[in-house]
Amino acid sequence: MKKAITVVVSAALILCLFAGCGGKSEGPKKVLNVYNWGEYIDKDLLEQFEEETGIKVNYKNYESNEQMYSVLKQGGVSYDVVIPSDYMVARMIDEDMLEPLNLDNIPSYSLINDKLKNPVYDPENKYSIPYMWGTVGIIYDPAKVGEVTSWGALFDKANAGQILMFDNSRDAMGIALKYLGHSPNTTDEAELNEAFELLKQQKSILQGYVMDQIFEKLESGEAAIGPYYAGDYLTMLENNPSLKFCIPEEGSNIFVDAMCILKGAQNKENAEAFINFMNSTEVSAKNSEFIGYTSPNVEVRDVLELSEDAKAVMYPSDEVLSKCEAFTNLPQKTLDYYDSIWIKLKS
């Protein structure tokens, strides 16, 4: 979720990675094909995993849950591990896209915070193990837009030309719904229409609809305010210490990104070894420090080598979290509505 990245891989390279390049066969090789959000892992850990296990990791990125889902549905790719967010895990379970996990091969599951076990999107963690969790908030430059405490700042004409907005319907509608006092998981037609009207009014004051570019534009100062992930805010601060972050008073989206194994994966045991590795305490702590997102491992917070201010962003108070909601998988009728209004909004 995650940090900005642009990935360009030629068709020939994809075929080499996932279909094998020509030449004499040397027999089965230990490989693992991972599909994850951009810049959402410490690449040194991939090398460490390869050294410890002898399993070669082929690694590719996507920008959003919807992009990942679309690529998988189109077929023609052969990934083993994917890392969708909570609501997308539920959708993929419903559509029989995931393999059940053998928790005997994932002993680090015992270190997962009990609050993150047995989630509504995957009871008993039959198909998924939490990878990282976090919150969506507003990142802004107070010198340009003042202090921000509400989602209303993203709809304020005073900030015209400086505002960025998520370029996907679920996140954008979720923000509008929260600002209006509704659940981001509502299926009520009147509430959805109200949020759509708000987004239509906002369109004229936006600098643009973007995803990964939010990171680049806010960090560089090209834009002054936009919604993004708490973990990325900590990274932005390294190059732009004037930025601030807030979880709006109306509440926000709390998300869990989870490691899953795709249905029919050719390297299931390798995938389970990878999942177990990534959730071990030392590895998860190093990964969390690098990407800025919150580990589900209960031992990690105490060993993080980060400032208390950084930890406060990564671990919001119970009071703040009580106002946050996780996205749930919506009925197909509502998903169709989202698709239709997004086409209208972007046209």
PLM regions: where:
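Periplasmic-binding protein-like
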Residues: G134, F196-Q201, N239-K263
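Early extracytoplasmic/lumenal segment of secretory-pathway proteins
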Residues: G27-M92, E216
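Extracytoplasmic ligand-binding site segments that recognize negatively charged/polar headgroups
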Residues: S78-E222
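Short, low-complexity disordered leader/linker segments with a strong preference
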Residues: M1-L32, S347
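Conserved C-terminal helix/tail region of periplasmic/extracytoplasmic solute-binding proteins
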Residues: D318-S347
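A ligand-binding cleft/hinge motif common to bilobed small-molecule-binding domains
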Residues: M88-R91, I225-S242
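Mature extracytoplasmic/periplasmic domains
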Residues: L262-S322
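Short, hydrophobic alpha-helical packing/hinge segments within bilobed ligand-binding/sensory domains
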Residues: M68-Y69, V89, I214-K217, D232-Y233, ...
